[in-house]
From Swiss-Prot:
Family per similarity comment: Belongs to the glycosyltransferase 2 family.
Primary localization: endoplasmic reticulum
Protein name (record): Dolichyl-phosphate beta-glucosyltransferase
Gene giving rise to this polypeptide: alg5
Record EC number: 2.4.1.117
Domain of life from the UniProt record: Eukaryota
UniProt record, GO biological process: protein N-linked glycosylation
Pathway membership, UniProt: Protein modification; protein glycosylation
GO cellular component terms, A-Z: endoplasmic reticulum membrane
Localization per record: Endoplasmic reticulum membrane
Keyword rRNA-binding among UniProt keywords: no
Top EC category: transferase
């Protein structure tokens, strides 16, 4: 046995001892995945502000954390993260505004705001949003312009922390999910909501055997299934589709989860649902109409690597108490 250990210990690759090399790699990976502090500050200077077009003045966004109850009787806050979305955003906004205005006319108690988070775009996304604001009452649409790119999770977090509504609906800027599905998501929310807590996730799991998925590349489908198994194993149990960008939160749920959210890139949905399950917040999935839209910023291979690293962070940083779950 001792001789075997000596042989293993003396084994080398290109003259480099394997065991010391393994220890060094393990320490570096552990530091990078578990201990490295890699989060950006919540706000940069004069970042959490919007321009009131009617008044021509700059105002600070309200704080979700400091305001337990909805502000200005807003029922729904629609949160739209946008990075270089000047081409795809107009179709989504037109669909959303039409639906929301019609709903407001039918239900006088229904009111809404749309917060579009320009996540450090290099195109004319902010200019486009400003043109929509000028067409709409200034209280309906607000632009949160981040000075640097934070990632989808970082943009959504900051948008929700500025929201006024009783409910917060996260939607993608590409309009992949039909906005009319909000009615279905809202109905389920009213059924599961308990003590002002609840999350309803739009789900594409019913499309797994459809042509939409069949037409994807073999690599992309393999990565999709592998990611699902990885998430189920390490973090979130029982949710078929963690990544759909159509999610509804109660205000109290948002107040409990988003202030301490750490992941700012694509895997932030996993952290949201991981925390929700740990806090016993009711969660439901609802099938939504979904269409793949050209122009995605997601590179399947590199994004999968980033998401895998983030999922490891989520699991072990909370497990080791590096990140705290606040009730």
């Amino acid at each position: 046995m001792i001789d075997l250990f000596i042989n293993i210990a003396s084994f080398t690759i290109y003259g480099i001892p394997v065991i010391p090399l393994f220890i060094i790699v393990f320490v570096i990976l552990s530091y990078y995945l578990l201990l490295l502090h890699d989060e950006s500050p919540l706000w940069l200077e004069k970042e959490n502000v919007y321009i009131d077009v009617k008044e021509g003045e700059q105002h600070q966004f309200p704080s979700l954390v400091e305001n337990k109850n909805p502000i200005d009787n807003i029922y729904l806050s629609v949160i739209v993260p946008a990075y270089n979305e000047q081409i795809r955003l107009p179709s989504m906004l037109d669909d959303a505004i039409k639906f929301l205005n019609e709903k407001s006319k039918k239900d006088l108690k229904f009111s809404y705001e749309i917060i579009i988070i320009d996540d450090g775009s290099k195109d004319s996304t902010a200019k486009l949003v400003t043109s929509y604001i000028e067409k709409q009452p200034s209280s309906n649409i607000r632009l949160l312009k981040l000075k640097q790119n934070r990632g989808k999770g970082g943009a959504v977090k900051r948008g929700i922390l500025c929201s006024r509504g009783k409910y917060c609906l996260m939607v993608d800027a590409d309009g992949a999910t039909e906005f009319k599905d909000f009615n279905r998501v809202e109905d389920i929310m009213h059924k599961i909501e308990k003590n002002d807590l609840g999350i309803v996730c739009g789900s594409r799991s019913h499309l797994v055997d459809s042509d939409l998925v069949a037409k994807r590349s073999f690599l992309r489908n393999i990565l999709m299934y592998g990611f699902h198994i990885f998430v189920q194993t390490l973090c979130v149990k029982g949710i078929k589709d963690t990544q759909c960008g159509f999610k509804l939160f109660t205000r109290e749920t948002a107040r409990r989860i988003f202030p301490t959210l750490h992941i700012e890139r694509w895997a932030f949905d996993v952290e949201i649902l991981y925390l929700a399950q740990k806090l016993n917040i009711p969660i439901a999935e609802v099938a939504v109409n979904w269409t793949e839209i050209d122009g995605s910023k997601l590179d399947p291979f590199s994004s999968s690597i980033q998401m895998a690293k983030d999922i490891v962070r989520i699991r072990f940083r909370y497990l080791l108490g590096i990140w705290k779950i606040k009730s």
